[in-house]
């Protein structure tokens, strides 16, 4: 089965990676591809700076679910509002729910309880794919926080289940932990760049997922790779014969960056034997055209 078809069978796809590697762009590209596979897809962003709409060519979400294409919607979530929404869902009496949310005890608990906000976001995604929410989807693509925080998010339900024990919150945490640990339901996509620090973080996250959750990611994406500069014949000194002499230094820098990419890809391959999608550097402005180009390149890699 091709990797894209395998991902399309999941109900939740969590995309994580070091900040600055193009994680949000890859999440948006995956959402677009899964929608093209016939799956009703919701893209979830939890960054308060809200940038997903720039790629999709829509208005900012502001917390609302916006249509972003055929079978594709997008939403920006604020973790605190999701926790409050969970209270309203579990406490059917509106006045009582409002009183609970306004209480100092709840405020302290919501801000300080380890893993609560992360679990609330994952629970929101689960209710959507289980058709228990007014917004419904076949698959949710979650643009998760950067690497370490992304791993903590995935581990949050299990940690919270151990901390709270029984009750509705404990039951919900255990249900979520089982859902995330099952690769039939939840897929993890790790985005990196073939540079020293991003690859090191990727290697550490792969190990962390195996240790904490007993499973590796489904897919690793190496983004923004410099193209092979061997299309020019000879060495840097020969480049000036074919191009403006001012390009020689640029071409040499290009060659060196490509060497770094190849070295780090070999290091990554030393610990990762699964699917590794390699995407080229695309010098384009952030927007729908960039998203279309990244989605096309990713689809080619996942055939």
Regions found by a protein language model. Give the residues of each.
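C-terminal lobe/tail of nucleotide-utilizing enzymes
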Residues: 1-7, 181, 185, 196-303
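Nucleotide-state-sensitive switch-loop elements of NTP-binding domains
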Residues: 2-13, 21, 26, 31-141, ...
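P-loop (Walker A) phosphate-binding loop of NTP-binding proteins
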Residues: 18
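Conserved nucleotide-binding/hydrolysis micro-motifs of P-loop NTPases
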Residues: 48-51, 79-83, 146-148, 194-198, ...
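Short, surface-exposed alpha-helical recognition segments that flank or form part
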Residues: 113-120, 193, 197, 256
């Amino acid at each position: 089965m091709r990797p894209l078809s395998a991902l399309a069978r999941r109900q939740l796809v969590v995309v994580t990676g070091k900040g600055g590697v193009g994680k949000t762009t890859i999440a948006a590209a995956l959402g677009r591809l899964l929608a093209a596979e016939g799956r009703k897809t919701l893209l979830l962003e939890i960054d308060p700076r809200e940038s997903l709409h720039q790629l999709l060519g829509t208005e900012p979400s502001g917390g609302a679910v916006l249509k972003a294409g055929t079978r594709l919607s997008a939403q920006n979530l604020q973790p605190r509002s999701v926790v409050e929404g969970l209270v309203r869902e579990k406490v059917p009496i509106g006045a009582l729910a409002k009183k609970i949310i306004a209480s100092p005890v709840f405020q302290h608990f919501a801000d300080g309880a380890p893993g609560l906000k992360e679990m609330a976001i994952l629970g929101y995604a689960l209710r959507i794919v289980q058709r228990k929410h007014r917004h419904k989807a076949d698959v949710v693509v979650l643009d998760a926080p950067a690497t370490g925080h992304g791993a903590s998010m995935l581990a949050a339900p299990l940690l919270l289940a151990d901390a709270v024990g029984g009750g509705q919150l404990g039951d919900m945490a255990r249900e979520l932990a089982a859902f995330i640990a099952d690769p039939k339901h939840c897929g993890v996509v790790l985005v990196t760049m073939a540079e020293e620090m991003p690859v090191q973080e990727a290697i550490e996250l792969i190990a962390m997922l195996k240790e904490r959750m007993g499973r590796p990611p489904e897919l690793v994406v190496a983004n923004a790779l410099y193209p092979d500069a061997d299309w020019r014949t000879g060495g840097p000194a020969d480049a000036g014969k074919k191009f403006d002499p001012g390009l020689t230094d640029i071409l040499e820098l290009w060659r060196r960056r490509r060497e770094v990419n190849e070295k780090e890809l070999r290091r990554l391959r030393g610990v990762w034997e699964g699917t590794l999608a390699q995407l080229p550097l695309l010098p384009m402005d952030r927007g729908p055209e960039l998203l279309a180009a990244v989605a096309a390149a990713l689809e080619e890699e996942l055939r």
